[in-house]
Amino acid sequence: MWRHRSTGWRKGVKAMDKKLYLDCGSGISGDMFVAAMIDLGADPDALQKALDSIPTDGFFVEIGRVKKSGIDCCDFRVRLDDDCENHDHDMDYLYGSLAPAAGSGCSCHEEPDREEHHCHCHEEGYDGEAHHCCRQEKDHHHPHRGLAEILPMIDACDMTETAKALARKIFRIIGEAEAKAHDLPLDEVHFHEVGALDSIVDVVAAAVTFDSLHIKEVIVPKLTEGTGTVRCRHGVMPVPVPATVNIVSAYKIPMELTGAKGEYVTPTGAAIAAAISTSHQLPPSFVIKKAGLGAGKRAYTCLLYTSDAADE
């Protein structure tokens, strides 16, 4: 079942603004963030309307539950009808020998030292069935897109003006970072992986789910990133990739590198954090009113805590 929790108030108690603590100790990507927002209670109707209104075909979305190290969390996946669309979520393409073997079991196995991405199995949804937002593919060719093509797609989506503004902001952050990385004018940047269909869906879903929760403050103490290399259409790049480095540098987001190999923080995830962050400092104490757990492709999770209570 989808769950939605309104802020509300009790008699004699003033309703407080919601605050979100974004714990990125396991990194952040677009799908992890969306899953966590859904787990917190994002409006399912708003998400459905937004996804149905994206002016393109060839994708569907699955929302379900998976276990990471034995912990139940939400899983958000964008599936493409055309397998050749891109390699954003193709772990064998991205990491080569770092990726799990085909047919490997799901990530519910207790393997704390495991670095491989978990398999692409999909567990059943909240009510025992997988949730789908289906779109029939009309054209197997999806060209790489620039901001000139992406921003009108966002404007055409059925979501609030606030959500549209956030989605545009996220893509502009990514575009500026890519422009700097490739020494190109912003209007000449074409988004390869980031501009591919699944990433557009991730950004629209991130904007609409976050907007539906009416969060006023977002605390992002740091982003935890891996090391090593990752493969993309430009070749093999160091982790963190240049676009991610440019985002955390421009928006002064603290970053911590771990010894684990692989990309924990994607440019889309970094851009989402940059777009919504209002602070990097947690209060000395606080009351946790609800937690949302979003599953990524690896065998760890991104935890997000939100509080609409006053700091203590």
Question: Would you name each region that the model predicts?
Answer:
Residues 305-310:
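Conserved small/polar residues in nucleotide/adenosyl-binding loops
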